[in-house]
C-alpha cells in the first residue's frame, strides 16, 4: 500500500523520468567556444600594427580571445584603444612595442587605453608577454624640457572587472599604470615592471601604480624597479589592497600627494608583506598645508604592515608641508585629517642618509594625527633608531624626538 507521501514521491519521480530535462531539449544551452583572433603583424617598425589589432577586436572583442603569439613583435605607432572588448581575453605572449616618437606621444594621455570596459583580461599565460613603452627618447627629452607631456603606459578609466596579469611592463615614458574614473574591481598580479635608462637621464615620474578614484583594486605579487612612487594612492582611492610587492629604487608606497587644489580623500587601504629596496622612503603620506588654494586632505583607515626595509632613506614618513616651504607652513600649518593610520611590523635597515633617524613624522599643527606604530624595529646602519615627531599623539607607540620636517 502506498502512503500519500510515498505516492507523491513516486508521482514526482515518474514525471521527471518521463520528461526530458530542459538542458537535453535545448540546443541553445550548449556552450559555444570563444572566438579566437590573431592580429596580422606588419613585421616592421615603420608599419603601425594598431589597425590590425583594432580589426581583431572588432571580430573577437565581444566575449572572444585575441592572441599575440610567442616570438612575435607588434609595433604600435599610435594609441591602442581597447574599446569594443567586453568580457574578452587578450593574451600577450609576444611583444607589444610602442614607438619612441616624442613628437607623436607628446601631449597624449595614454598609450594603451581601457575606457569604460566591463570584463577584460590582459595577460600572459606563459609569462613571456611584454608591453614595451620604449621610453628612452622621452627620458632624454624631459631632461631638457620639463614642460614635455608624456603618456601613461596603461590607462584605465571607468568600467569594472579588469585583470592585468603575468606580463612584463618596461620603460614607460611616464607612469606605468593609472586607474581612475570610478573604476571597480581591478586586479594586477604577477607583473614584472622596470623602467631603466641607458643614458645619464633617469626615467622620471615612472610611478608603478597611480590609483585614483576607484574601489576594490588589488595589486599582488608584483616587482617594480622605477624612479618615482612604487604605488601611489591618489584622491578617491578606496578599498585598495597591495600585497607581496617588491619595490626597488622608488619613492615608496605613498598616500598622496593630497590637497593640492581642493579637498581630497583616500580611505580603506591595506599595504602588507612589502619589500622596499633603496627607496627614498618605504611608506608615507604626503599632504599639502592650508592656505594658497589648497584643500583639506582626509586619510582614513590605512594600514602599512610587514615591511622589509633594505637601504631606504626613511622607513616611514609623514609630510604635512608638501609642495611648500618651511616658512610658508609656519604661517599656514598643515590641517590634514589622518584617522586610523596603522604602521606595524617594519623591520630592516635604512640607507644611513639620515642616520640615526629612521622615520620622520611631521603631522600638521592644525590637523588630526591619529597614527599608531608597533613592532617597529628598523635601525640605521649605526644601530640607532631615532624617530622624529611633531604634533603626534602620546599614544603613538614609539619614542619620539622633536624636529620632524617636511
UniProtKB/Swiss-Prot annotation:
Location of this chain's protein in the cell: Secreted
Domain of life: Eukaryota
EC nos: 3.2.1.-
Database matches in InterPro entries: Glyco_hydro_28, PbH1, Pectin_lyas_fold, Pectin_lyase_fold/virulence
Glycosylation sites noted in the Swiss-Prot or TrEMBL record: 301
One Pfam family recorded for the sequence: Glyco_hydro_28
Signal sequence extent: 1-18
MF-aspect GO terms: polygalacturonase activity
Transmembrane segments: none
Active site feature: 228 (proton donor), 251
Any one Gene Ontology cellular component term annotated for this protein: extracellular region
Primary subcellular site in the record, as a coarse category: secreted
Ranges for the PbH1 repeats: 183-213, 214-235, 237-257, 299-320
Keyword Glycoprotein listed: yes
Gene Ontology biological process terms, A to Z: cell wall organization; pectin catabolic process
Disulphide linkage map: none
Keyword list, A-Z: Carbohydrate metabolism, Cell wall biogenesis/degradation, Glycoprotein, Glycosidase, Hydrolase, Polysaccharide degradation, Repeat, Secreted, Signal
Family under the similarity heading: Belongs to the glycosyl hydrolase 28 family.
Function: Pectinolytic enzyme involved in the degradation of xylogalacturonan (xga), a galacturonan backbone heavily substituted with xylose, and which is one important component of the hairy regions of pectin. Activity requires a galacturonic acid backbone substituted with xylose.
Annotated protein name in UniProt: Probable endo-xylogalacturonan hydrolase A
